[in-house]
């Protein structure tokens, strides 16, 4: 009679023990795997980074490496948590500020006010914001004596240029630009006053005389001869 063979155990421990009789009888347990320091840091941070990285050859665009990572001594299944707890220093608060690597933003009048934080006042937005206006030109306050001298010079000549304007400005302790602007404004005022004095009828008279002169030239009529343009004869 054959005796029944004993039941074979197909556990990992029995199979390993059968192949390696010298091995230990203790079951295998998962253990922490050692990882070198440098590759682990590169894995956690996403990519290896030196002490300072530069996008371009501009010294203003350098990313300083301020956050250092400790050597990795955790279990492999904890790598995901470590990656969330220690993000790369590029995403640190001081690097999220675009002013650190885009210095031209502040020099741009349309975008500079958007990245200045909470210290931006309403006055600075009006001066440097997208709707900033050019500062108004300060009007010169002329003294009565200066105005009198300027009016007399205007009566003699409505256009003062060159050495005459330079001499007049020097005698009044003014700049040539101030004298030039005053004469421009005075000529505009003079023309407006002349139009107001003549009224709308003066324009019609000028147009009528212009047409009559053209008719005389076309028909070669003398100027002294009275011509009845309304006669039907």
UniProtKB/Swiss-Prot annotation:
Q: Pfam families given for it? A: Homeodomain (PF00046)
The subcellular localization recorded is: Nucleus
Q: Which UniProt keywords apply?
A: Developmental protein, DNA-binding, Homeobox, Nucleus
Q: Tell me a Gene Ontology molecular-function term this record carries.
A: DNA binding
Please give the residue ranges the record annotates as the region Disordered.
192-233
At which residues is the DNA-binding region annotated? 135-194
Query: Which residues lie in Basic and acidic residues bias regions?
Result: 193-206
Q: Which Gene3D superfamilies match?
A: Homeodomain-like
Q: Which GO terms describe its cellular component?
A: nucleus
Q: Which family does it belong to?
A: Belongs to the EMX homeobox family.
Known function: May function in combinations with OTX1/2 to specify cell fates in the developing central nervous system.
Record protein name field = Homeobox protein EMX1
The species this protein was found in: Xenopus tropicalis (Western clawed frog)
Encoded by which gene? emx1
């Amino acid at each position: 009679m054959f005796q029944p063979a004993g039941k074979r155990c197909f556990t990992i421990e029995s199979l390993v023990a059968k192949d390696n009789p010298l091995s230990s009888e203790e079951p295998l347990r998962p253990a922490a795997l050692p990882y070198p320091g440098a590759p682990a840091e590169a894995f956690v941070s996403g990519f290896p980074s030196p002490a300072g990285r530069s996008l371009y050859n501009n010294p203003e665009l350098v990313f300083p490496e301020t956050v250092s990572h400790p050597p990795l001594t955790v279990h492999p299944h904890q790598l995901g948590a470590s990656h969330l707890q220690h993000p790369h220093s590029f995403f640190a608060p001081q690097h999220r500020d675009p002013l650190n690597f885009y210095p031209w933003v502040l020099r741009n009048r349309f975008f500079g006010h958007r990245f200045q934080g909470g210290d931006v006042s309403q006055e600075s937005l009006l001066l440097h914001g997208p709707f900033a206006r050019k500062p108004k030109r300060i009007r010169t306050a002329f003294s009565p004596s200066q105005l009198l001298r300027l009016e007399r010079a205007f009566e003699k000549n409505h256009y003062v240029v060159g050495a005459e304007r330079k001499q007049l400005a020097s005698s009044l302790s003014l700049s040539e630009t101030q004298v030039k602007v005053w004469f421009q404004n005075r000529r505009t005022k003079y023309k407006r006053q002349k139009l107001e004095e003549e009224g709308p009828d003066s324009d019609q008279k000028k147009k009528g005389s212009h047409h009559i002169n053209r008719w005389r030239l076309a028909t070669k009529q003398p100027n002294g001869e009275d011509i009845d343009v309304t006669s039907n004869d």
